Amino acid sequence: MPMSLAADAVQPSPDTPTIRRRDAVAPGSWPEGTLPLLARLYAARGAETPELALPKLGSLHAPELLTGIDAAVGLLVEAIANDKRILVVGDFDCDGATACAVGVRGLRMLGAQHVFHAVPNRMVHGYGLSPSLVEELAELRPDLLVTVDHGIACHAGVTAAKARGWQVLVTDHHLPGPQLPPADVIVDPNLDGDAFPSKSLAGVGVIFYVLMALRRQMRDAGVFADGKGPDLTTLLDLVAVGTVADLVALDPNNRALVSAGLRRLRAGQGCVGLRALIEASGRDAARLTATDIGFALGPRLNAAGRLEDMALGIALLLTEDPRQARDIAQTLEQINSERRAVQQSMTDDAEQALTRVVLDMAGQRPVAACLFDADWHPGVVGLVASKMKDRLHRPVIAFAPAEPGADTLRGSARSIPGLHIRDALALVDARHPGLIERFGGHAMAAGLSLRLDHIDDFKAAFVAVVLEMLDPAALQQQVLSDGELAADELDHRYADALRLAGPWGQGFPEPLFDGHFEVANWRVLKERHLKLELRLPGVPGTINAIHFGGWHGNAPGRHVHLAYRLACDDYRGGSAIQLIVEHCLPG
């Protein structure tokens, strides 16, 4: 199959990453009985005290700090009071789906009688509120259109909606471009001059904040008979799932939201659809973690938007019928299995192409890679880009035809620390107007579209920008470790405590340890994974370890230096520990 990629190189970094231990930070005062290990891990992440490590909902930033939120509340109050038709338009990823569900559920809780929802189809409409989607939505006759998790880059779509006489409220969290859409109101913490301290609020978090502000206004106006209004914390299960799945930084504000949502899910108080999804994924709701959201719930919801239609995922999050929820969850399970197969095939193609390029470059790796295959699926290119970014430790953009045989390509970009990928695309766009049709995103991930006949020019322009913006030192991958665990800490009690701590995620990473071990035995599983039996002085018997995707044809030496996560081996009933290996180096 044809493959195209950028192959310009700077000074190559070694294939072997460098493991560096975090600087020690003295923890503050913790309650008696707190594991010293946990206090040390929190402190190393800038959370020296329980208040910083485990923020409560009472510490959330105030909604009024968001630019435009008072005007947004005014639009919604007027719409509810006058029984206007409110249309919530979501996005086809997990953040967009949960944001849509939060918007619909929350507005109905607050008294809106005519709330509808819609979501673009990735294959039909492309990203966000497009003019073609607006044309289809006209049959719903909305008075007020509310975008969630998108809209800041949808100038043409918002213009089309306004031309039909609709009011438009944009709620988004993506970085704005040089020209804002002509919406009536925009709420986005990343607007220039916005005073909201958390710039990492997810799309689902933004609409949740709008609802909180709306309830406060209605409460102050005496709308609610009980003087309080509905309990919006019942929506935090959805907020938690969307926030974690979107890989936004878990700053204290987001950790407060996610922690509260996880408590609801663990208590069995999540919405019917999420409870069904947890069951279908084989997870234990009582022990659910942010990692489970990121690796089990999020991918299953995202699979609908990648291969089918996210309307299915939103239906799951809105239904109150347990039987329907189970049926949809099983359908999502099947779609996710198909997604995994498609992703594996595309990843194999990409790895083969990159291997050829590295050979052609005498063992050097490209400074950035642009991958394209005419047979790839546009809904999966982001996963391939992420996988190749991890494999190369380079910025990667993967492209696929917008639809089979199309001349327009859809690309998904993933970056490494040191290169703001959206800013890089903005610089390409500024220097080569018309080369990119559309783009948007964040520091570490972005999306774009361009014409097939522009891909070679784009590759050259992108590589030139990367060479200019990226410090060569950033090409040397550094793995931050939380240090070595003592022999008595390699225990299921510590593994269980780490699992239920956190929540861990972007910007507040799950603990990663390192240590030197003797390899007692090893074998390869499913031709991809490396299973190890290890010995360590002071630990009786052997320690089980698994390096997923770690088999590349080279046997490990007798002694290894591992970067690993400590976990319980659920397959063995949870009593034995298992090391989840991230990096296996000669030791």
Language model: regions and residue ranges:
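N-terminal amphipathic/basic leader segments beginning at the initiator methionine
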Residues: 2-27
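Mid-to-C-terminal polyanion-binding domains and interfaces
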Residues: 74, 78-82, 322-371, 405-407, ...
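Flexible glycine-/small-residue-rich
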Residues: 90, 148, 170, 189, ...
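Active-site cavity-forming subdomains of large catalytic enzyme subunits
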Residues: 135-204, 208-225
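A short acidic, amphipathic alpha-helical/loop segment
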Residues: 156-160, 369, 384-387, 493, ...
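Histidine-centered active-site/metal-ligand motif
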Residues: 173-174, 377, 442, 529
